[in-house]
A protein has these predicted regions:
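ABC family nucleotide-binding domain
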Residues: 3-194
């Protein structure tokens, strides 16, 4: 990112921001609520247009007006603080939806990948459960697994522990720490210092 500016009305949230993230890095954006962390993540994923500056991804300026955001979004996974799981779908259905519908992958291959990830995140026994049958920490780990099934190059995590009870924060942070071993690039917005 080079000299990125983003405002909402007269409130300048990002002011000439420069940020360089290398492949395989885990970067934490730490600051109080309202400091622009979530806005920055939404700009990286092209969910928010920037007012000025440049956002480069894979050697391409993706911030130029008219750039199609969909190819970028297929390469960047995002996990929101509110989980955003579909309540009428099982854990497995939630996880497999995007890879099958958006990426055109085979359902059986996606289910096998999803089961392996659920196992890795300690949730294999929850594949047939619905979101309202899970704790907040379990729902957040399902959201992380869902983002990982598209095999993103970059994973954006937006305040993923902020809505959790203190006793559940540890299990979600452990899941993030385990991503370190995969070589994935992770950008984590948080006010959590642990």
């Amino acid at each position: 990112m080079q000299k990125v500016i983003k405002s909402f009305g007269t409130n300048k949230v990002l002011d000439s921001l420069d940020l360089d993230i290398q492949k395989g890095e885990i970067v934490s954006l730490i600051g109080p609520s309202g400091s622009g962390k979530s806005t920055l993540l939404r700009c990286i994923n092209l969910l928010e247009p920037i007012d000025d500056g440049e956002i480069w991804f894979g050697g391409i300026d993706i911030s130029v007006p008219g750039y199609d955001p969909n190819p970028v979004r297929r390469r960047i996974g995002m996990v929101f603080q509110s989980y955003n799981l579909f309540p009428h779908m099982s854990v497995m259905e939630n996880i497999c939806l995007a890879p099958v519908r958006v990426l055109g992958r085979k359902a059986n291959d996606t289910k096998a990948q999803a089961l392996a990830l659920l196992e890795q995140f300690g949730l294999a026994d929850k594949a047939k459960s619905y979101p309202d049958q899970l704790s907040g920490g379990q729902q957040q780990r399902v959201a992380i697994v869902r983002a990982l099934t598209i095999e993103p190059e970059v994973l954006l995590l937006d305040e993923i522990t902020s809505a959790l009870d203190p006793e559940l924060v540890g299990e979600v942070l452990d899941a993030v720490r385990n991503l370190r071993n995969t070589g994935m690039t992770v950008v984590l917005a948080t006010h959590e210092m642990s």
